Design a protein with these regions (language model features):
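Binuclear metal-dependent phosphoesterase catalytic core
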Residues: 112-123, 129, 235-299
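Accessory, non-catalytic peripheral segments of nucleic-acid enzymes
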Residues: 37, 42, 260-398
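N-terminal active-site segment of His-dependent metallophosphoesterases
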Residues: 1-68, 72, 380, 385, ...
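Conserved catalytic scaffold of divalent metal-dependent phosphoesterases
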Residues: 92-202
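Conserved beta-sheet core of the metallophosphoesterase superfamily
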Residues: 187-189, 193-264
Length: 398
């Protein structure tokens, strides 16, 4: 039995006004080819198929087309909802997808099922667990403090997993089949990126890996970096197939090829997802940024490299966007973001904490707040104009 474990596609993501359609199409084409090359029996998508609950039409088209194309290979597809996915959006096509060799699990309450091989014979028992919304697995109790609510939710998630595993064992019976569980959540020790949202805000930071049942493989989603959890080879995040934030660029992206033999996990192989949209982060003062940009001088690059430029100088030049534009206009790059480095923003805030509002004019307060935002020059000018207009209007009323 062979499966491909993938997650966090985030189809339809708007990345600093840029579409990811071409990247996602290339990934899905590669995934289809990979499934055929390795004669995979099933593909498990562990949540966040879409980036929003109301994905754009092109994202739905990518999803639907992939399902249709995969159906022709005999490979079964399992789609589980993540915290970004809408239950209603996934469920609206669930019945049709069932006729296309695809199982859609959008919410809690789905019992374990037999996952077939390509030839139709039983290959594994699947505990199809999506992102567990608290309202689906616990009832609200009045009078609980924050710690008690956290413990209540932790116990409910643990019980849900343990019950599903017990049901899977009953379904397996005496058959030599592996048990595969899924999940879309943060586990203790997982390394997150900037694009990952906290999903149990104020109640549960992370789920302890030791609370998972002893399934043969646990396919996790939500964390965008591939990693093994708790030193356990069978508990893994595969990560997203493309970088979803600039702090993910430069790191390899994977899909896991998981092989089972005689009802047990045999191997997990990391398959590198090809990069189709180069991205880079440049850090330094203006002189350093200028030097770093030279690496693309006289280079033929298609598509252009998407850049995040972090300025580390103490003085954040007011015309930095214009200077960066002049430096890059003849290079095969596209600057999506120009900002102070995080360390610099923190230093600015720390230095300003010694001042009080009474020492600053209204204009100074606004300008300092505006400088902390990651906006391009036109956006800054528009906000400055709106602020000035509002200030003059208020002055005229008093």
């Amino acid at each position: 039995m062979r499966i491909l474990h993938t997650s966090d596609w985030h189809l339809g993501q708007n990345f600093y006004s840029k579409s990811r359609e071409a990247e996602h199409q290339a990934f899905l084409d590669w995934l289809l080819e990979t499934a055929q090359t390795h004669q995979v029996d099933a593909i498990i998508v562990a949540g966040d198929v879409f980036d929003t609950g109301s994905p754009p039409s092109y994202a739905r088209t990518l999803y639907n087309r992939f399902v249709v194309n995969l159906q022709q290979t005999g490979c079964h597809l399992v789609v589980l909802a993540g915290n970004h996915d809408s239950v209603a959006t996934l469920n609206e096509s669930r019945d049709i997808m069932a006729f296309l060799n695809t199982t859609v699990v959008a919410s809690a309450g789905h019992a374990p099922q037999i996952l077939p091989r390509r030839d139709g014979t039983p290959g594994a028992v699947l505990c199809p667990i999506p992102f567990l919304r608290p309202r689906d697995i616990i009832t609200s109790q009045a009078g609980l403090n924050g710690i008690e609510k956290q413990q209540h939710l932790l116990a409910a998630i643990t019980d849900y997993y343990q019950q599903h595993y017990a049901d899977a064992c009953k379904l397996r019976g005496d058959q030599p089949l592996p048990i595969i569980a899924t999940g879309h959540l943060t586990t203790v020790g997982a390394s997150k990126s900037d694009a990952v949202r906290d999903i149990y805000i104020g109640t549960l930071d992370a789920f302890p890996a030791q609370n998972f049942p002893p399934a043969d493989y646990i396919a996790l989603g939500h964390i965008h970096r591939a990693q093994i959890i708790g030193g356990m080879e069978h508990v893994r995040y595969c990560g997203s197939p493309i970088p979803l934030s600039f702090d993910e660029c430069g790191k390899s992206k994977y899909v896991h090829l998981v092989t089972f033999s005689n009802g047990k996990l045999e191997s997990v192989e990391n398959l590198n997802v090809p990069v189709t949209q180069p991205m880079a982060v440049l850090k330094g003062d203006l002189a350093s940024i200028t030097a770093q940009l030279e690496q693309w001088r006289d280079v033929s690059q298609e598509p252009p490299v998407w850049l995040d430029i972090e300025i580390t100088t103490d003085e954040y030049l007011h015309d930095i966007h214009r200077k960066i534009q002049a430096l890059t206009e003849s290079l095969p790059v596209e600057v999506l973001l120009v900002r102070r480095s995080r360390e610099q923003r923190e230093r600015v805030l720390a230095s300003q904490q010694r001042e009080t509002l009474s020492e600053l004019s209204v204009e100074e307060v606004f300008n300092r707040r505006l400088a902390l935002e990651e906006l391009d020059e036109s956006q800054q000018q528009r906000l400055q104009h709106l602020f000035t207009t509002t200030l003059h209007t208020l002055a005229g009323e008093h």
